[in-house]
Amino acid sequence: MAHSKQPRRSVLVAARLITAVVSLAGAEAMLWFGGYPRWWAMDPQWGTTPPEYQSDSILGWQNRAGRFNLAWPDLSGTTLVTNWSQGRRATAEQEPAGDAANRPRVFSFGDSFVQGYQLSDSETLPWIVQQRHPDVVVSNFGTGDYATYQSYLAIKRWVHGPASVYHLFNAFHEGRNAADPNWLRVYKKTRGGFFFPYAELVAGDLQARKSPGNLVWYLSRRLRTVAMIQDYRDILESYGRVRNKRQLTQTLLMKMNQIVRTEAGKFTVILFDMSPPERKDYRKFLESQSISFVDCDRPELQDKKLRLPDGHPSQALNELLAQWIEPLQVVMDYSPEARSVPERR
């Protein structure tokens, strides 16, 4: 019986290459239609140093003192951002003079929601609170992309003596606290002393960690299949620490409360963006620890008209939030007792 003629080796190689290319193209198309990865549309400059920030040896970065006219891709014109000393954003036309030390102090800590991302100085929550209460000194320590852990470090640095301390908490801070891949991902290698500080729980104790960020691979920016491989690699690398993010975050909130109370102050958590189950869990936790909180579980929180295009609070939402946190908890006359101060209209 005659044997059938075998195809040339070159033909087999070519066929396999064509099959591989077609399969890769098909996989790319499926990932493209599925919108994967979500970070594909992130700013290609992410990881570079914005002018309004400077590196910090403990916090990773903080607001740089000065006045900045910033332009945003989805907004017309520019936004005036004024930063004072100590990494604070302005809450008044002039930075408080030395005699302000004799007035009750209100500190606001958090991420870009507190800082006032894409908002002018006068549209931010702390500025609005300052206008409602001219008899106190309000400080805005909110900083873009901060985690609860960085707010904890900032409280350790700046809260000395009695003060009313507010921390605006979003549920996505949990991932940042444990350095999940979504927070660490950068397109540009961080330089100039910038880094991502995070913490891990070891035998119940906080252990400080630092990361330069996870640089997106060159091919990940061009092939979604490669991006998927990098995604799973980063998820596996971070799994051990991210799985404990809820416990870690709750530990941070307890320590923040302890620091403020040790200084004879009052600590309050503002529960902002989170799912109903997350909100329920954090309410239960804060109540069990006797930590004061303001729950923003209101219909207005879901109103897209009160948000900027990227989801940050607008001035209108900040005006509402300033009402929701009333009566303002203020430590008066450097006494360890906190009392409510009525809103001034």
Where are the model-predicted features located?
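N-terminal Lys/Arg-rich, disordered targeting/topogenic segments
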Residues: 1-10
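Histidine-centered active-site loop/cap adjacent to the catalytic His
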Residues: 13-16, 308-345
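Hydrophobic membrane-insertion alpha-helices, especially the h-region
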Residues: 15-32
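Membrane/wall-proximal cationic-aromatic binding patches
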Residues: 36-133, 300-304, 324, 345
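Conserved SGNH/GDSL esterase-like catalytic core that processes O-acyl groups on lipids
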Residues: 115-192
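Short, amphipathic alpha-helical "lid/cap" segments that border enzyme active or binding sites
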Residues: 148, 152, 246, 250, ...
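Serine-dependent acyl-ester chemistry module
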Residues: 170-291, 296-307, 338-345
